[in-house]
UniProtKB/Swiss-Prot annotation:
Stored SUPFAM superfamilies: LDH C-terminal domain-like, NAD(P)-binding Rossmann-fold domains
Family named by the database record: Belongs to the LDH/MDH superfamily. MDH type 2 family.
Reaction catalysis annotation: (S)-malate + NAD(+) = oxaloacetate + NADH + H(+)
Protein name: Malate dehydrogenase
Binding site for substrate: R95, R101, N134, R165
Binding, NAD(+): G12, A13, A14, G15, Q16, I17, G18, N108, Q115, V132, G133, N134
Keywords, sorted A to Z: NAD, Oxidoreductase, Tricarboxylic acid cycle
Alphabetical list of PANTHER family matching this protein: MALATE DEHYDROGENASE
InterPro entries the record matches: L-lactate/malate_DH, Lactate/malate_DH_C, Lactate/malate_DH_N, Lactate_DH/Glyco_Ohase_4_C, Malate_DH_type2, NAD(P)-bd_dom_sf
Enzyme class: oxidoreductase
Annotated source species: Polynucleobacter asymbioticus (strain DSM 18221 / CIP 109841 / QLW-P1DMWA-1)
């Protein structure tokens, strides 16, 4: 018997990431090749954006995806989020010329407060929320705080792009297939301060740290390369990374819903005080997923260098949080 369709909301649906994301969702990459989906697409109530969204929907129709059971266009989150199972919050206010980070935070606080309230009002209480739009961790925190009736654990931020970027850098360094690397961790904020940590990682069962055995490469090449990869792509392409961000969003939700088979992945999730990270801070942690739930990998040893890096990225998150506290409900 065919499965009942799942409802997936995507915000910023006519944007660059949306364009890379929607066709893959409709093709079954997000929730499985036997799972029909209904897309509920949100764009800003601007004539140009809504017209662009119509064009994207025309293209989606023209793909004749067997799993696409329906789609609707919206300019109001109160209708876009009705009865949804999954929310991909991609749309966010980009940083314009001369804009301070605090201006960016407050502009996004308004968007994500409204979206959190709408999720609280009309989405399923079991909705799985992934925030992609930057600053992703803090935007997820704002949405979570604006939706008191949805469990906090259902709000996540995307660290998977950093995770995947780190995996590919390690694979290149070791000249091995990327799929052979396991147990990589990315701690903290989705920003250049995040800390990719391969101390526990294995390749073909052997320690990645021992195989590389180069602390200077870790500190001076690996960590900065992963941290500044987004900027390097803008420099090369003239546009921000959209397809790789969409791919990471698909990986994140796919694994959360369908499981990781014991493999470690990185998700930005609300802390419960693990690893000395204050409760409710949305922070990149290592997790495994099964039966639609993620579970943190606990008890990993934190050395002095790692603690320093983890505190540095935490301080940035706490600063962002402090910057939006007065805007929260």
């Amino acid at each position: 018997m065919a499965k009942a369709p799942m409802r997936v909301a995507v915000t910023g649906a006519a944007g660059q990431i949306g364009y890379s994301l929607l066709f893959r969702i409709a093709n079954g990459d997000l929730l499985g090749k036997d799972q029909p989906v209904i897309l509920q697409l949100l764009e800003i109530p601007d004539e140009k954006a809504q017209k662009a969204l119509t064009g994207v929907m025309m293209e989606l129709e023209d793909c004749a995806f067997p799993l696409l059971a329906g789609m609707t266009a919206h300019s109001d989150p109160m209708t876009a989020f009705k009865d949804i199972d999954v929310a991909l919050l991609v749309g966010a206010r980009p940083r314009g010329p001369g804009m301070e980070r605090k201006d960016l935070l407050s502009a996004n606080a308004q968007i994500f407060t409204a979206q959190g309230k709408a999720l609280n009002a009309v989405a399923k209480k079991t909705v799985k929320v992934l925030v992609v739009g930057n600053p992703a961790n803090t935007n997820a925190y704002i949405a979570m705080k604006s939706a008191p009736d949805i469990p906090a654990k259902n709000f996540t931020a995307m660290l998977r792009l950093d995770h995947n970027r780190a995996l590919s850098q390690l694979a290149n360094k070791l000249n091995k297939p990327v799929a052979d690397i396991e147990k990589l961790v990315v701690w903290g904020n989705h920003s250049p301060t995040m800390y990719p940590d391969y101390r526990f990682a294995t390749i073909d069962g052997k320690s990645v740290k021992d195989s590389i055995n180069d602390a200077a490469w870790n500190k001076d090449v690996f960590i900065p390369t992963v941290g500044k990869r987004g900027a390097a792509i803008i420099e090369a392409r003239g546009l921000s990374s959209a397809a790789s961000a969409a791919n990471a969003a698909i990986d994140h939700i796919h694994d959360w819903v369908l499981g990781t088979n014991g493999k470690w992945v990185t998700m930005g999730i609300p802390s419960k005080g693990e690893y000395g990270i204050p409760a409710e801070v949305i922070y990149g942690f290592p997790v495994t997923c099964e039966n639609g739930e993620y579970k943190m990998i606990e008890g990993l040893e934190i050395d002095e260098f790692s603690r320093e890096r983890m505190t540095h990225t935490l301080n940035e998150l706490l600063e962002e949080q402090a910057g939006v506290k007065h805007l929260l409900p």
